[in-house]
Amino acid sequence: MNTPESLKHTKWECKYHIVWIPKYRKKSLYKELRQYLGEMLKDLASQKECRILEGHLMSDHVHILISIPPKYSVSQVVGFIKGKSAISIARTYTGRRKNFTGQSFWARGYYVSTVGRDEETVRNYIKHQEEEDKRIDQLDLF
């Protein structure tokens, strides 16, 4: 098991596997946007004192293994990351500067699972998710 992190009066080890999708599960996370999002997600997480330990962006969903301090709820962090990244994507890739209301890049909701002793299993799952999806797609052809 890893060494717990600490706050002033707390030792903690809170890790979560989180998955979310673009609106309508559109396959929209490609090349330049994928790279841009990867850096942005790490930066946004650090603004909330979180660390992305593992992550993978598929064309139609995002997987992250994230460490979140107990002073923040998972929903606060996910809402912050999804909200700020959607605004940044709109500004950078669609040229919108203001009046962003009414549009969303990400679908509502997300999947979350706590990670404990199975951290290595979750890390491998996230790393190899793309190969697994391709393998399943090939099986579906027959």
Where are the model-predicted features located?
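Basic nucleic-acid-binding interfaces
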Residues: 1-142
